[in-house]
Amino acid sequence: MTPPILSMLDLVAVREGGTVAEALQIAVRTAQCAEDLGFARYWLAEHHNMPGIASSATAVLVGHIAGATQTIRVGSGGIMLPNHAPLVVAEAFGTLAEL
């Protein structure tokens, strides 16, 4: 039997009393652990105006986490298009896809 393909969705939660910088470091380590465990994908979700979530700059996080991992595919689980110019989103993720 073929094992299931596993993926993870991360909102990059900021722990109570923690900082955004700590949450971002934990996200990198989480992606690296997921990679070590054989996960195929690591998804990041975009959220704004929520002090407990640090994933507002999704394209930046995708690039940062992809640069800290080797084999896991890193991507966006959602972009809030009303908050962005569609061409900018297409160019940012098109560039990330080529890196």
Question: What residue spans do the PLM features occupy?
Answer:
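The substrate-binding groove and active-site-proximal loops of carbohydrate-active enzymes
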Residues: 75-83
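Glycine-rich, flexible loop/turn motifs
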Residues: 68, 77, 95
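Glycine-rich anion/phosphate-binding loops
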Residues: 21-26, 82-95
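N-terminal beta1-alpha1-beta2 module of alpha/beta enzyme domains
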Residues: 1-74
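Active-site-adjacent segment of SDR/Rossmann-fold oxidoreductases
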Residues: 98-99
